[in-house]
Amino acid sequence: MLNVPSQAFPAPGSQQRVSSQGRSKVPLKQGRSLMDWIRLTKSGKDLTGLKGGLIEVTEEELKKHNKKEDCWICIRGFVYNVSPYMEYHPGGEDELMRAAGADGTDLFNEVHRWVNYESMLKECLVGRMAVKPAVPKDCHEGKRVLNGMLPKSQMSDTLPRDVTDTLPREDLSSPSYDWFQTESSVTIVVYTKQKNISLDSVIVDLQDDSLRAEAVIKDHSYLVHVGLSHEVQENFSVRVIENVGKIEIVLQKKESVSWQCLGDHLEKHDSFIPKKDTGLYYRRCQLISKEDVTHDTRLFCLMLPPSTHLQVPVGQHVYLKLSVTGAEIVKPYTPVSDSLLSDFKEPVLSPNKYICFLIKIYPAGLFTPELDRLQIGDFISVSGPEGDFKVSKLQEVEDLFLLAAGTGFTPMVTVLNYALSHMSSLRKVKLMFFNKTEDDIIWRCQLEKLALREKRFDVEFVLSAPSPEWNGKQGHISRALLSEFLQRSSENSRAFLCICGPTPFTDEGIRLLHDLNFSDDEIHGFTA
């Protein structure tokens, strides 16, 4: 599993976490940092062993290169010689060797499918696997599409073999799509065959007259991806009819002409595959504001393109991508609202058109200093949402407890906002916020104002290195602190807990919660 070195996230002791499976790191030798790897890739040294040539690699050839000093790995159809990278891999050589001489795509996806390996390993590229590519069908070939819909008998033929092999899951039916037009508009309709589809399950991008519409259905992704046959306006509308699971995307024509077909089918069009097997898609977003929140944490607000529909679900994260010294570096961050108080600051843009992040700047890091150097008006690439937190976990919850350390507070922002505005069963939501000093507390004033305004909300601050004037709680997460904090509103009330912070904080917190008789079903840990 190719885990590209990272200094900024999750750095040792970092508090900004995402929800995924954990992994172990091994100490790297001196001179084996990410910057050292980038310098090596730019040194001109032949890292492939092929003296600059690219080859087609058969399965038989790939299997031969399965030793530490001669290790080839296939990721998503491309073969890399990762022998030079062995000493730079923070997950250790043994992790890389698990995929030696084989297809490592699944192992790679288990941990860091978001890593931009194409950029990080481009100087190690040996070539492509010798696999006959699928021939894409367009609207002018063979089977004609009537209003975008094939007869059911032909539907399976349009899916790539690797897609049909994984579908359908027993409790999921493959979605389908149709389209129709008026003189001024084109409407694409996706039939998800699932109820309770919400707007944040739909991601739409219009780029250079190609339409990419993704519907996230449970743990699968359905994609409509076409090169439109005619030009359309960049503004469009998205509507979800939740009770029948129907999605409507309405495009406005630039010219009042009759379309003979929707357009040419592009990569993975009409596919329905597990979300973990999909690649990340990025769109360029513009930085519109940047303001200090604490001495080392800033609030970055980005504007989405007008031709994008993207709403990040509660408790989920996205990936930010920047070019650093010529290499593309990707880091995960959890979006937040621009304020905890609706009238604290009037938003300058529609909430559906901008996305904000609370990000701690690490002066010695690689990514965050580069991010901090961005000027208003500059652009940064933002992926679609990722993460396994579902608001369905909060159904009928009466007592919600949030445990956060440092910037582990970020996923709690949307959870807190959702709880206070959408949970009719909620009696109490309590936040215990751990920091080093008073100066490190993010949005302290807003949290205190919210507690005064909202009778269901309480916040407690805990400092590990307080000033002599501090009158609040002190120390680190402990059984004594949690026992006092985790008081239910009634003896049999339904409770749920979220915890996020540095890995040792989260691990210890979950252990203590188990000791206090909270079950796994009552706990969600945002861990890296």
UniProtKB/Swiss-Prot annotation:
<dbReference type="Pfam" id="PF04969">
    <property type="entry name" value="CS"/>
</dbReference>
<dbReference type="GO" id="GO:0004128">
    <property type="term" value="F:cytochrome-b5 reductase activity, acting on NAD(P)H"/>
</dbReference>
<comment type="similarity">
    <text>Belongs to the flavoprotein pyridine nucleotide cytochrome reductase family.</text>
</comment>
<dbReference type="GO" id="GO:0042593">
    <property type="term" value="P:glucose homeostasis"/>
</dbReference>
<keyword id="KW-0479">Metal-binding</keyword>
<dbReference type="Pfam" id="PF00173">
    <property type="entry name" value="Cyt-b5"/>
</dbReference>
<feature type="domain" description="Cytochrome b5 heme-binding">
    <location>
        <begin position="54"/>
        <end position="130"/>
    </location>
</feature>
<dbReference type="InterPro" id="IPR018506">
    <property type="entry name" value="Cyt_B5_heme-BS"/>
</dbReference>
<keyword id="KW-0408">Iron</keyword>
<protein>
    <recommendedName>
        <fullName>Cytochrome b5 reductase 4</fullName>
        <ecNumber>1.6.2.2</ecNumber>
    </recommendedName>
</protein>
<feature type="domain" description="CS">
    <location>
        <begin position="172"/>
        <end position="263"/>
    </location>
</feature>
<dbReference type="InterPro" id="IPR008333">
    <property type="entry name" value="Cbr1-like_FAD-bd_dom"/>
</dbReference>
<dbReference type="GO" id="GO:0042168">
    <property type="term" value="P:heme metabolic process"/>
</dbReference>
<dbReference type="Pfam" id="PF00970">
    <property type="entry name" value="FAD_binding_6"/>
</dbReference>
<feature type="binding site">
    <location>
        <begin position="399"/>
        <end position="431"/>
    </location>
    <ligand>
        <name>FAD</name>
    </ligand>
</feature>
<dbReference type="InterPro" id="IPR001199">
    <property type="entry name" value="Cyt_B5-like_heme/steroid-bd"/>
</dbReference>
<dbReference type="InterPro" id="IPR051872">
    <property type="entry name" value="Cytochrome_b5/Flavoprotein_Rdt"/>
</dbReference>
<keyword id="KW-0349">Heme</keyword>
<feature type="domain" description="FAD-binding FR-type">
    <location>
        <begin position="280"/>
        <end position="392"/>
    </location>
</feature>
<dbReference type="InterPro" id="IPR037908">
    <property type="entry name" value="p23_NCB5OR"/>
</dbReference>
<dbReference type="InterPro" id="IPR039261">
    <property type="entry name" value="FNR_nucleotide-bd"/>
</dbReference>
<dbReference type="GO" id="GO:0020037">
    <property type="term" value="F:heme binding"/>
</dbReference>
<keyword id="KW-0285">Flavoprotein</keyword>
<feature type="binding site" description="axial binding residue">
    <location>
        <position position="89"/>
    </location>
    <ligand>
        <name>heme</name>
    </ligand>
</feature>
<dbReference type="InterPro" id="IPR036400">
    <property type="entry name" value="Cyt_B5-like_heme/steroid_sf"/>
</dbReference>
<feature type="modified residue" description="N-acetylmethionine">
    <location>
        <position position="1"/>
    </location>
</feature>
<dbReference type="InterPro" id="IPR007052">
    <property type="entry name" value="CS_dom"/>
</dbReference>
<keyword id="KW-0007">Acetylation</keyword>
<dbReference type="GO" id="GO:0048468">
    <property type="term" value="P:cell development"/>
</dbReference>
<dbReference type="InterPro" id="IPR017927">
    <property type="entry name" value="FAD-bd_FR_type"/>
</dbReference>
<feature type="binding site">
    <location>
        <begin position="372"/>
        <end position="387"/>
    </location>
    <ligand>
        <name>FAD</name>
    </ligand>
</feature>
<dbReference type="InterPro" id="IPR001433">
    <property type="entry name" value="OxRdtase_FAD/NAD-bd"/>
</dbReference>
<dbReference type="GO" id="GO:0005783">
    <property type="term" value="C:endoplasmic reticulum"/>
</dbReference>
<feature type="compositionally biased region" description="Low complexity">
    <location>
        <begin position="13"/>
        <end position="24"/>
    </location>
</feature>
<comment type="function">
    <text>NADH-cytochrome b5 reductase involved in endoplasmic reticulum stress response pathway. Plays a critical role in protecting pancreatic beta-cells against oxidant stress, possibly by protecting the cell from excess buildup of reactive oxygen species (ROS).</text>
</comment>
<dbReference type="GO" id="GO:0046677">
    <property type="term" value="P:response to antibiotic"/>
</dbReference>
<feature type="region of interest" description="Disordered">
    <location>
        <begin position="1"/>
        <end position="29"/>
    </location>
</feature>
<dbReference type="InterPro" id="IPR017938">
    <property type="entry name" value="Riboflavin_synthase-like_b-brl"/>
</dbReference>
<keyword id="KW-0256">Endoplasmic reticulum</keyword>
<dbReference type="GO" id="GO:0030073">
    <property type="term" value="P:insulin secretion"/>
</dbReference>
<dbReference type="GO" id="GO:0005737">
    <property type="term" value="C:cytoplasm"/>
</dbReference>
<dbReference type="GO" id="GO:0048471">
    <property type="term" value="C:perinuclear region of cytoplasm"/>
</dbReference>
